[in-house]
């Protein structure tokens, strides 16, 4: 019986994870569930899964959770705050951790799971984007197992030589596919008029609002490129992005002999989640088998960097190295939140990120303190740019 902590249980990845867990009560038991502010939903999940621990973002949220559960709180250790998150991730009674907290907030608890030698199902790409070599060094030092849950990285992992899930061994290049989001064919001159609801209406995937906006700008793919660089030790010049509107091929690995291996499937996060939970076995995930005859045509095109400047910025940050990816991620988080609050236009997201990258000093990412200092500096710089932009508009 595998005991699982779900970091970010109330998000879309949390939903999909718990759906797979529910299908296999003989294999999996929930040890801990965490959420930030969605206390109502967390209370409902606690009633169903009866975790040993539940963690929320604040003392107030913890009191609300206790009140909502009432007598049903018996046997559930309700805690709050960042330290409690790390304890849930590293607890000796937990075997595997689904790392699904969105953004920089997920780095410390994910690292705590790594340092405790857990099986880490990595859905929080920002952890690797920010800390890179520090993260992978911790994986090796503490003997953790990291299984990528992003559909692209999960596909790459499946297509690489087994027992050697890293670059080399005859691999020529790695191709990450991207749907192109909801604005792939929209006139570029109209993108400034895009609303948050339009940006969050992804054509293929059901996701949270932040990652949906990242998909619309293709920053999500840029972050995934950086993640792939660290996960698989791939030089930036061997990483390629290809737009594939149907989201059926989730990524590809090209080999020196001319072979190209691809992983296909319906666009449903339960597939990579089930793979990560059961690896190296396979289990039923509730996802229909792919019907290629019904799918028909599979199309591909190169990304237009004029339409998607955030993708180019991500490649620039990866090439710059050091703290540049952490700066990129922080500026993007601030910009996306400002867009969702209607403080800036959709097209200004890239402007905020580009200005922040250009104006923030980049140094070696040689410690977590350095990474978080760069993150904080970038957030201040991005907020300053947004405030100045709002005054001018």
Curated annotation (Swiss-Prot):
It catalyses: 2-C-methyl-D-erythritol 4-phosphate + NADP(+) = 1-deoxy-D-xylulose 5-phosphate + NADPH + H(+). InterPro entries: DXP_reductoisomerase (IPR003821), DXP_reductoisomerase_C (IPR013644), DXP_reductoisomerase_N (IPR013512), DXPR_C (IPR026877), DXPR_C_sf (IPR036169), NAD(P)-bd_dom_sf (IPR036291). Pfam families: DXP_redisom_C (PF08436), DXP_reductoisom (PF02670), DXPR_C (PF13288). GO terms for biological process: isopentenyl diphosphate biosynthetic process, methylerythritol 4-phosphate pathway involved in terpenoid biosynthetic process. It is an enzyme of class 1 (oxidoreductase). Its cofactor is Mg(2+); Mn(2+). It comes from the Bacteria. One of its GO terms (molecular function) is 1-deoxy-D-xylulose-5-phosphate reductoisomerase activity. Mn(2+) binds at residues 150, 152, 224. NADPH binds at residues 10-13, 38, 124, 126, 208. Pathway: Isoprenoid biosynthesis; isopentenyl diphosphate biosynthesis via DXP pathway; isopentenyl diphosphate from 1-deoxy-D-xylulose 5-phosphate: step 1/6. SUPFAM superfamilies: 1-deoxy-D-xylulose-5-phosphate reductoisomerase, C-terminal domain (SSF69055), Glyceraldehyde-3-phosphate dehydrogenase-like, C-terminal domain (SSF55347), NAD(P)-binding Rossmann-fold domains (SSF51735). Its EC number is 1.1.1.267. Keywords: Isoprene biosynthesis, Manganese, Metal-binding, NADP, Oxidoreductase. 1-deoxy-D-xylulose 5-phosphate binds at residues 125, 151-152, 179, 202, 215, 220-221, 224. Disulfide bonds: none annotated. PANTHER family: 1-DEOXY-D-XYLULOSE 5-PHOSPHATE REDUCTOISOMERASE, 1-DEOXY-D-XYLULOSE 5-PHOSPHATE REDUCTOISOMERASE, CHLOROPLASTIC. Catalyzes the NADPH-dependent rearrangement and reduction of 1-deoxy-D-xylulose-5-phosphate (DXP) to 2-C-methyl-D-erythritol 4-phosphate (MEP). NCBIfam families: Dxr (TIGR00243), PRK05447.1-1 (NF003938), PRK12464.1 (NF009114). Belongs to the DXR family. This is 1-deoxy-D-xylulose 5-phosphate reductoisomerase. The lineage of its organism: Bacteria, Pseudomonadati, Pseudomonadota, Betaproteobacteria, Burkholderiales.
């Amino acid at each position: 019986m595998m005991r699982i902590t779900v970091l970010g249980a109330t998000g879309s990845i949390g939903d999909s994870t718990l759906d797979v867990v529910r299908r296999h009560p003989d294999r999996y038991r929930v040890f801990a569930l965490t959420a930030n502010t969605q206390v109502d939903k967390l209370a409902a999940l606690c009633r169903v899964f009866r975790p040993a621990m539940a963690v929320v973002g604040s003392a107030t949220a913890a009191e609300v959770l206790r009140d909502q559960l009432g007598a049903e709180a018996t046997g559930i250790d309700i805690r709050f705050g960042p330290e409690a998150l790390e304890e849930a991730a590293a607890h000796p009674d937990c075997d595997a951790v689904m790392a699904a907290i969105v953004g920089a907030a997920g780095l410390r608890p994910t690292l705590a799971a790594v340092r405790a030698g857990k099986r880490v199902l990595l859905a929080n790409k920002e952890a690797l984007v920010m800390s890179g070599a520090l993260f992978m060094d911790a994986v090796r030092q503490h003997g953790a197992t990291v299984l990528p849950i992003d559909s692209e990285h999960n596909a790459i992992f499946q297509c690489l030589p087994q027992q050697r899930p890293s670059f080399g061994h005859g691999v020529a290049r790695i191709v990450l596919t991207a749907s192109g989001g909801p604005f792939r064919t929209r006139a570029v001159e109209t993108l400034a008029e895009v609303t948050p609801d339009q940006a969050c209406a992804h054509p293929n995937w059901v996701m949270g609002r932040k990652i949906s906006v990242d998909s619309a700008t293709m920053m999500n793919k840029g972050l995934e490129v950086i993640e792939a660089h660290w996960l698989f030790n791939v030089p930036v010049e061997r990483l390629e992005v290809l737009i594939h509107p149907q989201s059926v091929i989730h990524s590809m690995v090209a080999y020196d002999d001319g072979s190209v291996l691809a992983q296909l499937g319906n666009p449903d996060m339960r597939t990579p989640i089930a793979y990560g939970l059961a690896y190296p076995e396979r289990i039923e995930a509730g996802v229909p088998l792919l019907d290629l005859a019904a799918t028909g045509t599979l199309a591909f095109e190169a990304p237009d960097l004029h339409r998607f400047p955030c993708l180019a910025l991500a490649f620039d940050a990866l090439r710059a190295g050091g703290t540049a990816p952490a700066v990129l991620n922080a500026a993007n988080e601030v910009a996306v939140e400002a867009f969702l609050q209607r403080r800036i236009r959709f097209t200004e997201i890239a402007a905020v990120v580009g200005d922040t990258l250009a104006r923030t000093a980049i140094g070696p990412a040689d410690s977590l303190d350095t990474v978080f200092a760069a993150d904080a500096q970038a957030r201040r710089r991005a907020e300053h740019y947004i405030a100045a932009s709002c005054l001018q508009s």
